[in-house]
């Protein structure tokens, strides 16, 4: 066992002495040591229940003959960090989480890992760390939050964000915003729609790193405790079989994950996180071109908030991710191995879809192609990303004058000051991985526009958008403005065309004019220190997954 590095032989007497101080006895040194990476925190709703849930994981490990060792890593709530400097730390936190898992696992020679993430950056961060360590690993995602209820309708965090815009437009009162605020998020779990956290949980299950139905089991359901217990037992089987992430995270597994992402209409942030996870695995290549290729042949078959009114609970009841996989048929490589030690095909053999209004059949899709589209053009030569499945048909093609802003704060102020008109194309730049730094999400401006019912407006940014965003919002523009990307050359009044169906984004400027403008402009100075200063120097472009190099 790998843990023999710290527990076997006379030279490891000092190590055993320290382990005895932790409560171990003679019989424990022959058992596998399992690290549990818990991301419990009291300020993130998706993580507040993990302190209790981890105890069921430990019980499963002990029952199967292992020794659990819990350690912790950080978790940032994107909702709470939204629209202020805190959001600059969200994406960079992914790298800290990955490094924490890697450091703890290698520093203590764990034989296996159980990962317990829930929210946006924690899931990919933990997967990246586990891929580096490459010991048997299983993931227990925390589970989605139940939807809130307001006036007989489902409500979630995006309902609250959009209510702020509605109040600004005089459509509802401040008191009504307060009532929505109180009921939209009823308890523990990752926000109830198909936002980034739940999308990444679905990706994790599809990759084969968590047990079937893990992604959609409600956070507060007793079934989630059983899922945690069974995962604890299963990690011992994985250690005995020496089934590692490198055996599971194949090219076919990543293709499957992107396929399910497209079918669900998942968060555009997967175009950052899936490539970043793949970057940690040998002989696997995931690019925006692969997303584009799969998007063109996989239909969008689920309409979950923010694209529609269904919730993750509805998806679970209809068949969960196994039901989506079963529906996709030969678009999925069912030979991929999973943490059950069985193939994906064996896992879903007896699954049935119980509600075809939630998981549509392939012959009756919501859209004929995938929920995410990759756009290219002279604004984004290396690509940009849009959550196509959450764009209404009448907004698939836009052409209008640019209004240019050099920060999220500037555009948000302009929207609330009612300076944005229908037909405008808002350009938000210097918000990329280097330029922000940290590639902030632009949920406040998009939610404000939605709440004000200003519909015929496009948004383009080298930052990113929340998984809760809907509408013609194009993010991840690469190269970013801080890296001399063409988005930095756009000026107020330039005519921009967005054609989502044809994967095209362009400004009516010649290459020569773009080059001249870029040569004569100065990037704004960003006064950053600490971790963000380091991050801005080593982070790569969004089209690489914003990896560090």
Swiss-Prot record:
MF (Gene Ontology): 2 iron, 2 sulfur cluster binding; dihydroxy-acid dehydratase activity; magnesium ion binding
InterPro entries membership: Dihydro-acid_dehy_C, DihydroxyA_deHydtase, DiOHA_6PGluconate_deHydtase_CS, ILV_EDD_C, ILV_EDD_N, IlvD/EDD_N
Alphabetical list of Gene3D superfamilies matching this protein: IlvD/EDD C-terminal domain-like
GO biological process: isoleucine biosynthetic process; L-valine biosynthetic process
Names of required cofactors: [2Fe-2S] cluster; Mg(2+)
Domain of life of the source: Archaea
Record pathway: Amino-acid biosynthesis; L-isoleucine biosynthesis; L-isoleucine from 2-oxobutanoate: step 3/4; Amino-acid biosynthesis; L-valine biosynthesis; L-valine from pyruvate: step 3/4
SUPFAM superfamilies cross-referenced by the UniProt entry: IlvD/EDD N-terminal domain-like (SSF143975), LeuD/IlvD-like (SSF52016)
GO CC, one annotated term: cytosol
Positions annotated to bind Mg(2+): 78, 120-121, 441
Residues annotated to bind [2Fe-2S] cluster: 119, 191
Modified residues (N6-carboxylysine): 121
Catalytic activity: (2R)-2,3-dihydroxy-3-methylbutanoate = 3-methyl-2-oxobutanoate + H2O; (2R,3R)-2,3-dihydroxy-3-methylpentanoate = (S)-3-methyl-2-oxopentanoate + H2O
A family per Pfam: ILVD_EDD_N
Note accompanying the cofactor annotation: Binds 1 [2Fe-2S] cluster per subunit. This cluster acts as a Lewis acid cofactor.
This protein's UniProt keywords: 2Fe-2S, Amino-acid biosynthesis, Branched-chain amino acid biosynthesis, Iron, Iron-sulfur, Lyase, Magnesium, Metal-binding
Record carries keyword Flavoprotein: no
List of catalytic residues: 466 (proton acceptor)
EC numbers for this chain: 4.2.1.9
Known partners and oligomeric status: Homodimer.
Family: Belongs to the IlvD/Edd family.
Protein function: Functions in the biosynthesis of branched-chain amino acids. Catalyzes the dehydration of (2R,3R)-2,3-dihydroxy-3-methylpentanoate (2,3-dihydroxy-3-methylvalerate) into 2-oxo-3-methylpentanoate (2-oxo-3-methylvalerate) and of (2R)-2,3-dihydroxy-3-methylbutanoate (2,3-dihydroxyisovalerate) into 2-oxo-3-methylbutanoate (2-oxoisovalerate), the penultimate precursor to L-isoleucine and L-valine, respectively.
PANTHER family: D-XYLONATE DEHYDRATASE, D-XYLONATE DEHYDRATASE YAGF-RELATED
The name this protein goes by in its record: Dihydroxy-acid dehydratase
Lineage: Archaea, Methanobacteriati, Methanobacteriota, Methanomada group, Methanobacteria
């Amino acid at each position: 066992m790998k843990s023999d590095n710290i527990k076997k032989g006379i030279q490891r007497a000092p190590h055993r002495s320290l382990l005895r101080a932790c409560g171990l006895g003679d019989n424990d040194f022959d058992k596998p040591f399992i690290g549990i990476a818990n991301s419990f925190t009291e300020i993130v709703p998706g993580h507040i229940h993990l302190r209790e849930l981890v105890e069921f994981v430990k019980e499963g490990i002990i029952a199967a003959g292992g020794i659990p060792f819990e350690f912790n890593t950080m978790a940032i709530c994107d909702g709470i960090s939204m629209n202020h400097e805190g959001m600059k730390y969200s994406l960079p936190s992914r790298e800290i989480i990955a490094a924490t898992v890697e450091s703890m696992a290698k520093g203590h020679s764990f034989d296996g890992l159980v990962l317990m993430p829930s929210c946006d950056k924690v899931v990919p961060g933990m997967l990246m760390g586990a891929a580096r360590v490459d010991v048997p690993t299983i993931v227990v995602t925390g589970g989605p939050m139940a939807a809130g209820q307001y006036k007989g309708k489902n409500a979630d965090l995006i309902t609250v964000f959009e209510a702020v815009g509605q109040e600004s437009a005089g459509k509802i009162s401040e008191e009504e915003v307060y009532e929505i605020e109180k009921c939209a998020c009823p308890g523990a779990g990752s926000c109830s729609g198909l936002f980034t956290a739940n999308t990444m949980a679905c990706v994790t299950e599809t990759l084969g790193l968590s047990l079937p139905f893990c992604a959609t089991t409600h956070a507060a359901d007793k079934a989630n405790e059983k899922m945690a217990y069974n995962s604890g037992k299963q990690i011992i089987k994985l250690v005995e079989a020496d089934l590692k992430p490198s055996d599971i995270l194949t090219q076919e597994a990543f293709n499957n994950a992107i396929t399910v992402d497209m079918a669900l209409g998942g968060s555009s942030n997967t175009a950052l996180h899936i490539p970043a996870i793949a970057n940690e695995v040998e002989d696997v290549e995931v690019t925006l071109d692969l997303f584009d290729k799969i998007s063109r042949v996989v239909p969008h078959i689920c309409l979950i908030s923010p694209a529609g009114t269904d919730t993750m609970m509805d998806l679970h009841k209809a068949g969960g991710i196994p039901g989506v996989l079963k529906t996709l048929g030969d678009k999925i490589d069912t030979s991929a191995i999973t943490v059950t030690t069985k193939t994906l095909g064996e896992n879903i053999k007896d699954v049935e879809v119980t509600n075809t209004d939630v998981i549509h059949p392939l012959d009756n899709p919501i859209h004929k192609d995938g929920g995410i589209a990759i756009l290219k053009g002279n604004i984004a030569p290396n690509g940009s990303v849009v959550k196509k499945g959450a764009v209404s048909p009448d907004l698939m093609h836009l052409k209008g004058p640019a209004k240019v802003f050099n920060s999220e704060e500037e555009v948000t102020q302009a929207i609330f000051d009612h300076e944005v008109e229908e037909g405008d194309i808002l350009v938000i730049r210097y918000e990329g991985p280097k330029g922000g730094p940290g590639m902030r999400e632009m949920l406040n401006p998009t939610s404000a526009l939605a709440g004000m019912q200003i519909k015929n407006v496009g948004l383009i940014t080298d930052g990113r958008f929340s998984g809760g965003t809907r509408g013609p919002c194009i993010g991840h523009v690469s190269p970013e403005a801080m890296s001399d990307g063409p988005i930095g050359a756009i000026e107020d009044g330039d005519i921009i065309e967005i054609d989502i169906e044809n994967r095209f984004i362009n400004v009516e400027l010649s290459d020569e004019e773009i080059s001249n403008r870029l040569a004569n402009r100065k990037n704004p100075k960003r006064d950053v220190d600490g971790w963000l200063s380091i991050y801005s120097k080593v982070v790569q472009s969004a089209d690489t997954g914003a990896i560090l190099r």
